[in-house]
From Swiss-Prot:
It is an enzyme of class 3 (hydrolase). NCBIfam families: PRK00913.1-1 (NF002072), PRK00913.1-4 (NF002074). Keywords: Aminopeptidase, Cytoplasm, Hydrolase, Manganese, Metal-binding, Protease. This is Probable cytosol aminopeptidase. GO terms for cellular component: cytoplasm. Mn(2+) 1 binds at D275, D352, E354.
C-alpha cells in the first residue's frame, strides 16, 4: 500500500474518496464544514435527519455529493470535539481503513490527520495512521491453499496536513511508520509460523537472510550446541536437551554509528520455538499457543529490520536465543543442578521455567560486546499476564534512567509498558538449599522473581527486561501474534538516534 502527504483544500480533491471527521452531537469538523458549504448544506442536512451521530467509529459513506469533485465522501465519527485521545484516534483510522477496503475504494485522501489529538503533533498522527493502516490490513495466509483477497483492495492513501511547512514532518512520519510496520509484520510472520517449520534453525536462516539483505551494515553468525558446550552455556543446553532440533543462538550485528568503536545497544530475544514445558509438562489445552514462546526473538528480529531499513546511526546487536523445550529421555529434570556460563549454579525446580535458563547464559554471553545497555524481551511468565493483563508489557530494570527511557518510548509509540519493582525481598524467594539459586521463587510475584533471577546475570551492564507474555499474541477468534513490542523498541532506538519526530 502506498502512502503520501500533501497540503490542499478539500474542494480541490479529485479522488475516489475523501475521509473527514464528524463530532458528537452531529457537529462537522472544520474540513467537513468546508465540504458542506461547497455542497450547499448537503452534509449538514443529512446529519440533521439523524444519519450520523458522530460517536467514535460510526461511518456514513456518501456518493456523488453535489459540487464535490471526488466520487465519495466518507464521514467518520470522532466522538466529542477536542476530546479525541490516542486510542480513539487509532480506532477511527482502523474503522476508516476497513470501510474503504470493504467498499472497494482503491485510493483516498484522508483529512483525519488534521484532527486535534491531545498532546500529539502532525508527525505522530501521520505515523500512527500509517502503522494502524498496515496493522489493519495484515493477514497471515502463507500456509493457506486458497487465499481470499478483497475485490478491489485499498492501494493508496494520501494524508492531508494543515500547512505546507508540515509536509517534511509528514513525509518523515511515513518513512518511519512504514519501517516500523515492516518490522512488526516480520515479527508477526515469525510468531505465527507453526513450530514444525519455525525451529531454531529457521530463526537462524531468517537472521542470515537479513544480513544478506542489508550486507553493508549487518553481519550474522550462528552459534550451535558444540560451541555452546565449549563456552559453558550449560543452562541453555539443558533446556534444549529433550528436543531433536538443535539449539542455535543467532547473533546479528548492525554497525551504523559513524564511530565504529561506539558501544552497542544489545537486544536479546527469548526464542523458544515450542515450549511443551519439558518434564514439567504443560496442560494440553492451549498448548498450541506455545509456538508463540519465541515472540521475544521475533521482536528482536523485527527491530533489527527497522534499524537496517532506517539506517539508524547506532551500533545495535540482536541475539535470537533459539531453542525447543520438549520432554524425553534426554530432557533435563526437576532436581537437576546446572552450572551456568557465569559460574553460578541453579537448582531446577520446574522445567517449565525454562526461558530464564536460556536467557541467563545469553545475558552472560553478551558481556563480550562491552554493551552500552542490554534489553531482553521474553514471553517469560504467566504471572505477568495476571498482573497486567493483555494490554501492557511488564518492565523491570536495574537502571532507573533506562527504565524511564523505555516507559517514555512506550507512551510515544502507543505500545505501553509498566515498571514493576525489584526489591531485595523478592530475591530471597529464589534461595536454594542445594545451589546458588532456584529457577523459580514460588507463585507470589512470579514476574518479579523471574526478573530478579535474570538480574543476577546482568551485573556488568545497564539492563532492562520486557515480559511480553500478555502482549505478544492474542487468543480466541483474533488469534495471532501482535508484533509487540517492536514499536516500543523501535521508538526507543529512534529517540537514541535523535529522530523522535518532535517538531
Amino acid at each position: 500500500m502506498e502512502f503520501s502527504v500533501k497540503s490542499g483544500s478539500p474542494e480541490k480533491q479529485r479522488s475516489a474518496c475523501i475521509v473527514v471527521g464528524v463530532f458528537e452531537p452531529r457537529r462537522l469538523s472544520p474540513i467537513a464544514e468546508q465540504l458542506d458549504k461547497i455542497s450547499d448544506g448537503y452534509i449538514s442536512a443529512l446529519l440533521r435527519r439523524g444519519e450520523l451521530e458522530g460517536k467514535v467509529g460510526q461511518t456514513l459513506l456518501l456518493h456523488h455529493v453535489p459540487n464535490i469533485l471526488s466520487e465519495r465522501i466518507l464521514l467518520i465519527g470522532c466522538g466529542k470535539e477536542r476530546e479525541l485521545d490516542e486510542r480513539q484516534y487509532k480506532q477511527v483510522i482502523q474503522k476508516t481503513i476497513n470501510t474503504l477496503n470493504d467498499t472497494g475504494s482503491m485510493e483516498a485522501v484522508c483529512f483525519l490527520t488534521e484532527l486535534h489529538v491531545k498532546g500529539r503533533n502532525t508527525y505522530w498522527k501521520v505515523r500512527q495512521a500509517v502503522e494502524t493502516a498496515k496493522e489493519t490490513l495484515y493477514t497471515f495466509d502463507q500456509l493457506k491453499s486458497n487465499k481470499v483477497e478483497p475485490r478491489r483492495p485499498l492501494r493508496k492513501m494520501v494524508f492531508n496536513v494543515p500547512t505546507r511547512r508540515e509536509l517534511t514532518s509528514g513525509e518523515r512520519a511515513i518513512q518511519h511508520g512504514l519501517a516500523v510496520s515492516s518490522g512488526i509484520k516480520a515479527a508477526k510472520d515469525l510468531g505465527n509460523m507453526p513450530p514444525n517449520i519455525c525451529n531454531a534453525g529457521y530463526l537462524a536462516s531468517q537472521a542470515r537472510q537479513l544480513a544478506d539483505a542489508f550486507s553493508t551494515n549487518i553481519t550474522t553468525r550462528v552459534i550451535g550446541e558444540q560451541q555452546m558446550k565449549e563456552l559453558g552455556m550449560n543452562a541453555y543446553l539443558a533446556v534444549g536437551a529433550g528436543s531433536r532440533n538443535e539449539s542455535l543462538m543467532s547473533v546479528m550485528e548492525y554497525k551504523g554509528n559513524p564511530n565504529p568503536d561506539a558501544k552497542p545497544i544489545v537486544l536479546v530475544g527469548k526464542g523458544l520455538t515450542f515450549d511443551a514445558g519439558g518434564i514439567s509438562i504443560k496442560p494440553a489445552e492451549g498448548m498450541d499457543e506455545m509456538k508463540y514462546d519465541m515472540c521475544g526473538a521475533a521482536t528482536v528480529y523485527g527491530v533489527m529490520r527497522v534499524v537496517a531499513e532506517l539506517n539508524l546511526p547506532l551500533n545495535v546487536i540482536g541475539v535470537l536465543a533459539g531453542c525447543e523445550n520438549m520432554p524425553g529421555g534426554s530432557a533435563y529434570r526437576p532436581g537437576d543442578v546446572l552450572t551456568t556460563m557465569s559460574g553460578q549454579t541453579v537448582e531446577v525446580l520446574n522445567t517449565d521455567a525454562e526461558g530464564r535458563l536460556v536467557l541467563c547464559d545469553t545475558l552472560t554471553y553478551v558481556e563480550r560486546f562491552d554493551p552500552e545497555l542490554v534489553i531482553d524481551v521474553a514471553t517469560l511468565t504467566g504471572a505477568c499476564v495476571i498482573a497486567l493483563g493483555h494490554h501492557i508489557t511488564g518492565l523491570m530494570s536495574n537502571h532507573n534512567p533506562l527504565a524511564h527511557e523505555l516507559i517514555g518510548a512506550s507512551e510515544q509509540a502507543g505500545d505501553r509498558a509498566w515498571r514493576l519493582p525489584m526489591s531485595d525481598e523478592y530475591y530471597e524467594q529464589l534461595d536454594s538449599n542445594f545451589a546458588d539459586m532456584a529457577n523459580i521463587g514460588g507463585r507470589p510475584g512470579g514476574a518479579i522473581t523471574a526478573a530478579c533471577f535474570l538480574s543476577r546475570f546482568t551485573r556488568k551492564y545497564s539492563w532492562a527486561h520486557l515480559d511480553i507474555a500478555g502482549t505478544a499474541w492474542r487468543s480466541g477468534k483474533a488469534k495471532g501474534a501482535t508484533g509487540r513490542p517492536v514499536a516500543l523498541l523501535s521508538q526507543f532506538l529512534l529517540n537514541r538516534a535523535g529522530l523522535n519526530g518532535d517538531d
